[in-house]
Curated annotation (Swiss-Prot):
Molecular function via GO: large ribosomal subunit rRNA binding
GO biological process: translation
Family: Belongs to the universal ribosomal protein uL10 family.
Protein name as annotated: Large ribosomal subunit protein uL10
Job description of the protein: Forms part of the ribosomal stalk, playing a central role in the interaction of the ribosome with GTP-bound translation factors.
């Protein structure tokens, strides 16, 4: 008979994977409790959560998760040593940036791999998406791009109106003298 606490842990991990299917796995050996708390706080700001995992239980939850069971996910030798899973709903680039920036200051945090939209990213993939703009930044860029022509037209019309006003003023002054 399986240990009830392990069954519960697998169920909890499956629930997390189904709610937040994108994730990063990172080694945290050597981080202090304060460091872990700081990292968790930064990750919460991005709408993600970090959980220290038991590797075998995470693998089992991954295989049983409805989001992931149709994918043959192979992370190779990633499952060695203590790992933390950082779960994200859809903002994995922002989460990856938080992890990458944190790892610059705290070398004990080592990004191992990630999983986003059905693809295993690997360490280099996670670091690459960390350089991408966030969803909010992309939306702002699109809005600026859409708004730019209208702004240019309005500016052009204002310049024409100002030139016309100056010309009328000049004619009025000339006729008035």
């Amino acid at each position: 008979m399986a240990n009830p606490s392990k069954i519960e842990a697998v169920t909890e991990l499956k629930t997390r994977l189904e709610k937040r299917p994108n994730f990063i796995l990172a080694s945290y050996s050597g981080l202090t409790v304060e460091d872990m708390s700081n990292l968790r706080a930064k990750l919460r700001k991005e709408g993600s959560e970090m959980k220290v995992i038991k590797n075998n239980l995470f693998l089992r939850a991954l295989k049983e998760s409805s989001e992931h069971k149709n994918n043959s996910i192979d992370f190779g030798d990633v499952y060695k040593g203590p790992l933390a899973a950082i779960f994200s709903l859809d903002a994995l680039p922002a989460v990856a940036k938080v992890c990458k920036d944190f790892a610059k200051d705290k070398k004990e945090l080592e990004i191992k791999t990630g999983y986003m939209d059905g693809e295993v990213l690997g360490k280099s993939g996670v670091e690459a998406i960390a350089g991408l703009p966030s969803k909010q930044e992309l939306l702002a860029q699109v809005a600026r791009g859409i708004n730019a022509p209208a702004t240019q037209i309005a500016s052009g019309i204002n310049q024409i109106m100002a030139s016309l006003a100056r010309a009328i003023n000049a004619v009025a002054e000339k006729n008035g003298n």
